[in-house]
Regions:
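Aromatic- and glycine-enriched glycan-recognition loops and surfaces
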Residues: 1-37, 41, 131-141
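Active-site-proximal substrate-binding groove within the catalytic cores of carbohydrate-active enzymes
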Residues: 32-40, 46-106, 112-246
């Protein structure tokens, strides 16, 4: 159900109608595989993917600029997340589809199902990456069969079947010194097949946003921005500081 603090179902229906009158579409953004510490119904020990060693769960965070390890909270516990075991993915996907089927939504925005693939290396019921891939593909198909449009972030090849939009598509190459030239191979393959865009322009750390915009146009990507209804300053001293420019 829609949280009462967010306006409930009626306000969601009103928002969808307002966006439709402007010619837009409303997508429900959902993360199935990266479960944050603030989740109330998640059983961490049972449902989190594990390493080979007993007691080690797949828990990550944001990149620490000092150590470059992607396990830091940087002072905000909501930055920490667990990787859901592929074993439990069908359970959560089916529950989500069942609970949202009656809402007036144009589609679903899959925050991590299109760019996150991982194994579960627990000693019993081990699930390797190939098995995880089959599970993810089956759930992507189930979401596509729901009749809603599908948007994915990142857009790995296995996630593109039945997808209408791709956001956060790669617009740059690696920063390795050995790389001489950048070729937009990803965009060359997708162009004309699905709509795609890169990172929101107003959240990119850059001293030349105009060049970033022109690069998107050159690569055939739609310019993208992220906006918030309230003052962005309300997100100061929070894990959402990456959205401070919205």
């Amino acid at each position: 159900s829609v949280l009462r603090q967010l306006g409930g179902k009626n306000r969601l229906e009103n928002l969808n109608s307002a966006i439709a009158r402007l010619g837009g579409e409303l997508y429900a953004d959902v993360a199935f595989q990266k479960v944050t510490q603030i989740s109330k119904h998640y059983m961490e020990n049972q449902e989190t993917s594990r390493y080979y060693g007993a007691g080690y769960i797949a828990q990550f965070g944001v990149t620490n600029p000092a150590s470059l390890r992607r396990t830091s909270a940087l002072g905000y516990s909501e930055n920490i997340y667990n990787l859901l075991s592929p074993k439990f993915l069908p359970y959560y996907v089916s529950g989500f589809l069942s609970s949202t089927k009656d809402y007036s939504l144009n589609g679903y925005s899959l925050r991590d199902l299109g760019n996150e693939l991982h194994a579960d290396k627990r000693r019993t019921e081990l699930i390797n990456r190939e098995q995880a891939l089959m599970i993810v593909e089956s759930q992507l198909q189930a979401i596509a069969d729901s009749g809603k449009n599908v948007m994915v972030s990142g857009g790995n090849l296995y996630a593109l079947n039945g997808v209408k939009h791709v956001i956060d598509a790669p617009m740059t190459a690696t920063e390795y010194v050995i790389v001489d030239e950048t070729i937009p191979l990803y965009e060359m393959i997708l162009h004309g097949c699905v709509d795609y865009t890169g990172q929101a322009l107003n959240t990119i750390v850059s001293d030349d946003w105009q060049a970033k915009l022109l690069k998107m146009v050159e690569y055939g990507a739609s310019p993208r921005y992220t906006f918030t209804a309230q003052q962005a300053s309300d997100m100061k001293h929070m894990a959402l500081t990456r959205l401070y420019a919205t």
